[in-house]
């Protein structure tokens, strides 16, 4: 008897073999995996009539084409969600549900918010794997890292490429060894701008990040300042050594924390952009402030700007539950301290800053404390699955 996964795979393959659909999909880039047949199956299987599509900025140019194809082959109506989507934390199931959508399809990010936690609306994540020619990267690694042990990381789009890279080099005749670390609940090799694995510096010679831009790369650099970092940009096909001013960042953040120690009135910003503002984390911070006898108010904001915060002159220090990198990267642009939850815990003497790195564990299952999203204290309790019992009778 075929498993459910096998049955689904068969149905998706039948949809994918539709010659008309194949022709329609030619307008999309062939090396981008938008999983349109799987999405069509999902819409049909859930009998969804009104489907929300959410894209990051780099993929929204394909939104209209994908929407047209989905409507053509399922008869559903689609709505393209136009609010800015910075990352996996911005999945906006609340808005999609409030609009009466049956299904939300989120493109370009991993399942940071599990589908079982999007109550009241069906959910589909499409990672949009991007297939690239790895021959040049393989040559670069051979040329520059003979006899070295490397860690390779990336965003979710290039995770399959990391697996190919590891298989290529982890052979008996290769002097190069490649590891793919994992920071659960992320996929092996995946890094976010706020979450990355903490590595044993004695075991590795370098980190190689596959991808463009520096936001995700800087996360693992901040978390592992002792290890040299390199970036391979698959679009420019360049391998570069990358640097980060750890001393300046540390000076700025500790300076803000020291000012916060003396503050009496705090503003807690609960981010409302998608799922950024975790209510349990906000409540944990409120409890910490209450124990220290501090005054506070809660403010809901989708995006955080100095001009907006200046409208609250009575607040001495701000703490935002949205994105740690907003404080780390842009905190000096705000006239008053703008901390994120870990830094408030430091300011209130609930934890000390590690001497050799700055934590990037905001969504890690193994985070330092209950001021992070997936700390054990904040994880949704999953119901245990009931055992599936099959009773067979012996043929006489």
Swiss-Prot record:
Region (Disordered) location: 372-396
Cofactor dependency: [4Fe-4S] cluster
Top-level taxon: Eukaryota
Catalytic activity: L-histidyl-[translation elongation factor 2] + S-adenosyl-L-methionine = 2-[(3S)-amino-3-carboxypropyl]-L-histidyl-[translation elongation factor 2] + S-methyl-5'-thioadenosine + H(+)
Annotated binding of [4Fe-4S] cluster, by residue: 89, 194, 323
Keyword Chloroplast set for record: no
UniProt GO molecular function: 2-(3-amino-3-carboxypropyl)histidine synthase activity; 4 iron, 4 sulfur cluster binding; metal ion binding
InterPro entries referenced in this protein's UniProt entry, alphabetically: DPH1/DPH2, DPH1/DPH2_1, DPH1/DPH2_2, DPH1/DPH2_3, DPH1/DPH2_euk_archaea
Cofactor annotation remark: Binds 1 [4Fe-4S] cluster per subunit. The cluster is coordinated with 3 cysteines and an exchangeable S-adenosyl-L-methionine.
Example GO BP: protein histidyl modification to diphthamide
Pathway: Protein modification; peptidyl-diphthamide biosynthesis
Stated role: Catalyzes the first step of diphthamide biosynthesis, a post-translational modification of histidine which occurs in elongation factor 2. Dph-1 and dph-2 transfer a 3-amino-3-carboxypropyl (ACP) group from S-adenosyl-L-methionine (SAM) to a histidine residue, the reaction is assisted by a reduction system comprising dph-3 and a NADH-dependent reductase.
NCBIfam families, per the entry: diphth2_R
Assembly and oligomerization: Component of the 2-(3-amino-3-carboxypropyl)histidine synthase complex composed of dph-1, dph-2, dph-3 and a NADH-dependent reductase.
Family: Belongs to the DPH1/DPH2 family. DPH1 subfamily.
Protein's name in the database: 2-(3-amino-3-carboxypropyl)histidine synthase subunit 1
Taxonomic source organism: Caenorhabditis elegans
Gene behind this protein: dph-1
């Amino acid at each position: 008897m075929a498993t459910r996964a096998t049955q689904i795979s068969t149905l998706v393959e039948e949809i994918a073999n539709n010659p008309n659909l194949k022709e329609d999909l030619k307008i999309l880039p062939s090396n981008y995996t938008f999983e349109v047949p799987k999405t069509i199956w999902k819409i049909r299987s859930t009998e969804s009539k009104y489907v929300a599509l959410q894209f990051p900025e780099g993929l929204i140019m394909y939104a209209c084409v994908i929407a047209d194809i989905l409507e053509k082959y399922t008869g559903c109506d689609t709505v393209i969600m136009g609010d800015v989507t910075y990352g996996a934390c911005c999945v906006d199931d609340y808005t999609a549900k409030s609009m009466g959508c049956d299904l939300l399809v989120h493109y370009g990010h991993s399942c940071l918010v599990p589908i079982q936690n999007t109550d009241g609306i069906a959910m589909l994540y499409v990672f949009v794997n991007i297939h690239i020619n790895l021959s040049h990267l393989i040559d670069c690694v051979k040329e520059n890292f003979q006899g070295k042990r490397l860690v390779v990381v990336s965003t979710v789009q290039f995770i399959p490429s990391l697996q190919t890279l590891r298989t290529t080099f982890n052979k008996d005749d290769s002097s190069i060894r490649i590891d793919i670390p994992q920071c659960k609940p992320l996929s092996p090799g995946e890094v976010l701008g706020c979450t990355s694995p903490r590595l044993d510096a004695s075991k590795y010679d370098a980190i190689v990040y596959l991808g463009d831009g520096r936001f995700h790369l800087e996360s693992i650099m901040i978390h592992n300042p002792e290890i040299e970092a390199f970036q391979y940009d698959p679009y420019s096909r360049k391998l570069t050594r990358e640097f980060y001013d750890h001393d300046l960042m540390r000076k700025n953040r500790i300076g803000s924390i020291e000012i916060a120690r003396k503050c009496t009135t705090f503003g807690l910003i609960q981010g409302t952009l998608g799922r950024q503002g975790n209510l349990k984390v906000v409540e944990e911070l409120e409890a910490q402030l209450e124990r220290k006898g501090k005054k506070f108010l809660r403010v809901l904001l989708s995006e955080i700007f100095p001009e907006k915060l200046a409208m609250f002159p009575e607040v001495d220090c701000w703490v935002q539950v949205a994105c740690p990198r907003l404080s780390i990267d842009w905190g000096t642009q705000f006239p008053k301290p703008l901390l994120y939850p870990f830094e408030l815990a430091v300011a209130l003497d609930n934890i000390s800053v590690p001497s050799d790195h700055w934590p990037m564990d905001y969504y890690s299952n193994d985070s330092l404390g209950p001021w992070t999203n997936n700390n054990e204290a904040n994880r949704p309790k999953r119901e245990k699955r009931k055992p599936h019992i099959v009773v067979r009778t012996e043929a006489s």
